Regions:
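Recognition helix of helix-turn-helix DNA-binding domains
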Residues: 169-204
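Basic, Lys/Arg-enriched C-terminal extension of HTH/homeodomain DNA-binding domains
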Residues: 194-225
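Short, flexible helix-to-coil linker/hinge segments that flank and couple to helix-turn-helix
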Residues: 88-94, 98-99, 104-157, 161, ...
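Active-site residues of response regulator receiver
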Residues: 53, 81
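Short hydrophobic/Thr-rich beta-strand motif most characteristic of the beta2 strand and flanking loop
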Residues: 6, 26-34, 41, 199
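Short amphipathic alpha-helix used as the core "switch/output" element in two-component signaling
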Residues: 40, 62-74
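Acidic catalytic/metal-coordinating carboxylates
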Residues: 34, 60-63
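Two-component/phosphorelay signaling modules centered on CheY-like receiver
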Residues: 12-30
Length: 225
């Protein structure tokens, strides 16, 4: 029996290409196009593996993976993304994923990664792994620096969800409907988020969402008033 797989990507052509690569060896049971649909698909199918893009709408891939790992701890997760930056890689493995593959990889690498992850190993694309090694080597050869304090932003998972939806241009009413709470609750969350981040306007909140990796800069829409 073929292992069951979910492919989560908001770009249909990308998802279809990945499905084509996997279909000979895996049973692709769902191709959700946003983070919330991914969570529902995992709860419905309980697949062996999910391949997840980071830049998913409504709920980004990393936060969706947090939900998925809580509801289905046995699932294996591979991030499939264009983001090779170290902070994305670090956050992905903090979330609990087992693999990190770049979309620039060849089909053979993707198949190898899925097999490695399903047999209990961790897989990172060589380009990403080499980047992490290079950064570690650079850090080890640099003279010690006096650490400079940086502000720590600690948003709850729900606050991150609200911030992403604000940055995607959703109105308070739309956000409330999406996460199934009242508009007053959304107003409360936005006020707390603004206070935590030290910002006041929607544009500033959007910039913070980009900084936190909740949305990609190219995906920032016109805001809804």
């Amino acid at each position: 029996m073929k292992p069951q797989v979910i492919v989560a990507d908001d770009h249909r052509l990308v998802a279809e290409g990945v499905v084509k690569i996997l279909e000979k060896e895996y049973n692709v049971v769902a191709t959700p196009t946003d983070g919330r649909a991914l969570i529902k698909a995992v709860e419905k199918f309980r697949p062996d593996l999910a391949l997840v893009d980071i830049s998913l709408p409504l709920l980004n891939g990393l936060d969706a993976c947090r939900h998925v790992k809580k509801s289905c701890p046995e699932i294996k997760l591979i991030i499939l993304t264009m983001h090779a930056e170290q902070h994305f890689v670090n956050e992905a493995f903090r979330v609990g994923v087992e693999g990190y593959v770049l979309k620039t990889s060849l089909a053979d690498e993707l198949l190898f990664a899925t097999k490695e992850v399903l047999r209990g190993c961790t897989y990172i694309s060589p380009v990403v792994a080499q980047g992490l090694v290079n950064q570690a080597l650079e850090s080890s050869t640099e003279p010690p620096k006096r650490p400079t304090p940086t502000p720590t932003v600690t948003l709850s998972l729900r606050q991150r969800e609200v911030l992403q939806l604000v940055a995607e241009g959703k109105s308070n009413k739309e956000i409330a409907s999406t996460i199934n709470v009242t508009v007053k609750t959304i107003e409360f969350h936005k006020a707390r988020i603004s206070k935590e981040l030290g910002v006041h306007t929607t544009a500033e909140l959007t910039k913070q969402a980009i900084t936190l990796g909740l949305i990609a800069p190219a995906e920032t829409p016109q805001t809804t008033h």
